[in-house]
A protein has these predicted regions:
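Short conserved AdoMet
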Residues: 57, 133, 167
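Short-chain dehydrogenase/reductase
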Residues: 137, 155, 171-173
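Active-site/ligand-binding-proximal alpha/beta "capping" segment
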Residues: 149, 163-164
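Terminal amphipathic alpha-helical/low-complexity segments used for targeting or macromolecular assembly
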Residues: 1-59, 177-180
């Protein structure tokens, strides 16, 4: 099994594998091109994102700056909007449903490191997927950790750190993020 397959399947892998390093460089080059493109060139911007991400709807907008590790593990649904400074560490799948709205300075981090310092110091990593349902709004400065599923019709309040699943039809806030009421 290749290191890339291990990574995508959530197994311990070596992020310094030559193929993975080259994949990250390709993604960083596309992010650089996207982030430095004239804002008026909307069609060119869309083409870069479509070539970078694993799947997109037809209607999306990502404000620069945007950064990801690989891109091919990210899927965004129809009517996706992200404000400035979105970071997606997509060592495995990060899936967004339709009608997703993301405030500024948000991060979605699938990358995990062993708690054991000897394994961690060897450079080993693993990843856990993130799944976001339909009709979800993230306030600014939200962080979502790998292994989390966020249901449909959810609002995540600004500054929240999401470490556990959030059920459908919820408003959730805080660090750690917790449901405060149903909608």
């Amino acid at each position: 099994m290749s290191e890339k397959q291990k990574m995508i399947e959530g197994k311990i892998y070596n992020p310094n594998d030559k193929t993975l390093v080259m994949d990250r460089i390709k993604a960083k080059n596309l992010c650089y091109a996207y982030n430095n493109l004239n804002p008026e060139l909307t069609e060119e911007k869309k083409e870069i994102i479509k070539s970078l991400l694993g799947k997109t709807g037809d209607n999306f907008q990502i404000e620069p700056s945007f950064f990801c590790d690989y891109g091919y593990n990210v899927e965004i649904g129809e009517n996706f909007y992200s404000n400035h400074n979105l970071v997606i560490l997509d060592c495995t799948k990060v899936t967004f449903g339709k009608n997703t709205f993301i405030g500024p300075n948000c991060g979605f981090y699938t990358a995990e490191h062993p708690l054991d310092c000897q394994a961690r110091n060897k450079g080993q990593e693993f990843a856990k997927p993130i799944s976001v349902g339909d009709n979800v709004w993230f306030g600014g400065n939200v962080v979502v950790i790998g292994g989390v599923t966020i249901g449909n019709n959810v609002v995540i309040g600004a500054g929240s750190i999401v470490t556990k699943d959030i059920p459908d039809n919820s408003i959730a806030v805080g660090n750690p993020c917790r449901v405060i009421r149903k909608v």
